[in-house]
Amino acid sequence: MDAPGFTASLVAGGVAGVSVDLILFPLDTIKTRLQSPQGFNKAGGFRGIYAGVPSAAVGSFPNAAAFFLTYEYVKSLLHTDSTSHFKPVKHMLAASTGEVVACLIRVPSEVVKQRAQVSASSKTLQIFLTILSEEGIQGLYRGYKSTVLREIPFSLVQFPLWESLKALWAWRRGHVVDSWQSAVCGAFAGGFAAAVTTPLDVAKTRIMLAKAGSSTAVGNVLSAMHGVWRSQGLAGLFAGVLPRMAAISMGGFIFLGAYDQARSLLLEVGRKSP
């Protein structure tokens, strides 16, 4: 990947990430409280739905930038013909690698954000310092494995589907898709991926919110899912599925549309610069 492509992916990914995280934060808070083991009302209900937003704001730019930079770089390494049947595999590998890298940034901000979302009376900085003093750096990375195990299946569905829908639309229209068309494809791909990976998201939320030293805090995803299944059944595994689908569908529209638009503009500016 050349220098203009590097810069375009870095900046466009960051801009897209900040945009979607801040716009859709209330839906994310509602989803987190629905999945909380203490229940929606005790976790705060509809009160203080912007609790934890500083953590999201700080982490969103570097997180999204790291993902898209890795995604585009891995795609550039895995050359395939435009008609190759291996294109979906390339997109899967690129997205999976991107998630592993991005989660190194995402997980600490996610841990702080989710704890703030279910205890709106506590300040984000206070929660961050409490985690550091009581659990150390390890506490900030609690749920790293469960987050990666959620994000990789999500990306294995979302990104190949997004790329395939764009290619199909471009073929039907006879030209490369516009940014808004890319956004529509992103919304559909994101909503579908969100629905099928909700049980993994529930497990990740329970692990991040669990009390230090508890069996759930160990981070075993299957054990967390089994615990939810035993206590709440299928409804528990799909708790928050509707706000999650709504947030990620709208997020896919904003995120992938903004990314395509910003990257195209940055590359165009780069070509015009002397």
From Swiss-Prot:
**Which stretches are Solcar repeats?**
4-77, 86-168, 177-265
The listed locations are: Mitochondrion inner membrane
Q: Which biological processes are named by the entry's GO terms?
A: mitochondrial S-adenosyl-L-methionine transmembrane transport; S-adenosyl-L-methionine transport
Which regions form coiled coils? none
Task: State the annotated membrane topology for this chain.
Answer: Multi-pass membrane protein
The record's catalysed reaction(s) read:
S-adenosyl-L-homocysteine(out) + S-adenosyl-L-methionine(in) = S-adenosyl-L-homocysteine(in) + S-adenosyl-L-methionine(out)
Annotated GO molecular function terms are: S-adenosyl-L-methionine transmembrane transporter activity; S-adenosyl-L-methionine:S-adenosyl-L-homocysteine antiporter activity
Tell me if Cytoplasm is a UniProt keyword of this record. Answer: no
Query: Might you report a single GO cellular component term?
Result: mitochondrial inner membrane
Q: Which InterPro entries match?
A: Mit_carrier, Mitochondrial_sb/sol_carrier, Mt_carrier_dom_sf
Keywords assigned by UniProt, alphabetized: Antiport, Membrane, Mitochondrion, Mitochondrion inner membrane, Repeat, S-adenosyl-L-methionine, Transmembrane, Transmembrane helix, Transport
Q: Where are the transmembrane segments?
A: 5-25, 49-69, 85-105, 142-162, 182-202, 238-258
Q: What does this protein do?
A: Mitochondrial S-adenosyl-L-methionine/S-adenosyl-L-homocysteine antiporter. Mediates the exchange of cytosolic S-adenosyl-L-methionine, the predominant methyl-group donor for macromolecule methylation processes, for mitochondrial S-adenosylhomocysteine(SAH), a by-product of methylation reactions.
Name the family the entry cites.
Answer: Belongs to the mitochondrial carrier (TC 2.A.29) family.
PANTHER family hit by this protein: S-ADENOSYLMETHIONINE MITOCHONDRIAL CARRIER PROTEIN
Name assigned to this protein: Mitochondrial S-adenosylmethionine carrier protein
Organism per entry: Mus musculus
Q: What is the lineage of its organism?
A: Eukaryota, Metazoa, Chordata, Craniata, Vertebrata
